[in-house]
Amino acid sequence: MIDSIVGTIQEVFNNYVILNYNNIYIKIFCNSTKFSEFLGKEKRVYVSLKFNENLSELECYGFLTREERELFLKLQKVTGVGSKLALQILSSIDYQQLIVEIAKGNVARLEKVKGIGKKTASRIILELKETLKKEFKVASTSGTEEKTYEKLEEISLALLSLGYEIDEINQVLSSEDFSELSLEDGIKLALKKLSKI
């Protein structure tokens, strides 16, 4: 299975780019707005290969980070969400912000994405909310009190909304004891630690 491809972003179109890999030109469906910043430049693209609906053609979907690709794959596990709609969602909402919105249960925000109604938005939140909350924050131990667990969750979501990477957040939250701190002080401490990474 191909994990990623390094090549030059040769051309940018509405919902895909052409990537030049050793003079082999690959069509990659993606968030073309993000990829347009790298037109003419060499870039590593994390890919996911999928057969189209007719099973007649293998399509390549590309992302700038491994985390965004993983979220793309998770979205497709939701009933009624295929590759095209999953990409549409990630092209409309930054993947880190999308994690926050799903974790918060923000149906209204998801409904704003073209092609998503209330039913699909609700299903996405129902099926992914707990999974994302567990995966994109430090896991609690058996002795951790519920209040501390919730506090770490809120700190994680706050830092995600500020644009910090998930791996960095987990590193900081697992290296400090936040149990005696208020939410505000916890966020301040986390930001201080993140500035040193």
Curated annotation (Swiss-Prot):
Renumbered to this chain, region (Domain II) spans 65-143
Q: What GO terms in the biological process aspect are recorded for it?
A: DNA recombination; DNA repair
Annotated region Flexible linker: where? Answer: 144-152
In terms of SUPFAM superfamilies, this protein maps to:
DNA helicase RuvA subunit, C-terminal domain, RuvA domain 2-like
Region (Domain I) residue ranges read 1-64
> Disulphide bridges in this chain?
none
Compartments, as annotated in UniProt: Cytoplasm
Q: Which residues cross the membrane?
A: none
Keywords on record: Cytoplasm, DNA damage, DNA recombination, DNA repair, DNA-binding
Positions of the UniProt region annotated as Domain III: 152-197
InterPro entries, A to Z: DNA_helicase_Holl-junc_RuvA_I, Hlx-hairpin-Hlx_DNA-bd_motif, NA-bd_OB-fold, RuvA, RuvA_2-like, RuvA_C, RuvA_C_sf
Against Gene3D superfamilies, the record matches this protein to:
5' to 3' exonuclease, C-terminal subdomain (1.10.150.20), Nucleic acid-binding proteins (2.40.50.140)
State the source organism's domain of life.
Answer: Bacteria
Cellular component, GO, one term: cytoplasm
Q: Which HAMAP family match?
A: DNA_HJ_migration_RuvA
The family line of this record is: Belongs to the RuvA family.
How does the record describe its quaternary structure? Homotetramer. Forms an RuvA(8)-RuvB(12)-Holliday junction (HJ) complex. HJ DNA is sandwiched between 2 RuvA tetramers; dsDNA enters through RuvA and exits via RuvB. An RuvB hexamer assembles on each DNA strand where it exits the tetramer. Each RuvB hexamer is contacted by two RuvA subunits (via domain III) on 2 adjacent RuvB subunits; this complex drives branch migration. In the full resolvosome a probable DNA-RuvA(4)-RuvB(12)-RuvC(2) complex forms which resolves the HJ.
**Known NCBIfam families for this protein?**
ruvA
According to its UniProt entry, the function of this protein is described as: The RuvA-RuvB-RuvC complex processes Holliday junction (HJ) DNA during genetic recombination and DNA repair, while the RuvA-RuvB complex plays an important role in the rescue of blocked DNA replication forks via replication fork reversal (RFR). RuvA specifically binds to HJ cruciform DNA, conferring on it an open structure. The RuvB hexamer acts as an ATP-dependent pump, pulling dsDNA into and through the RuvAB complex. HJ branch migration allows RuvC to scan DNA until it finds its consensus sequence, where it cleaves and resolves the cruciform DNA.
Record remark: domains: Has three domains with a flexible linker between the domains II and III and assumes an 'L' shape. Domain III is highly mobile and contacts RuvB.
Name listed for the protein in its UniProt record: Holliday junction branch migration complex subunit RuvA
The gene coding this protein: ruvA
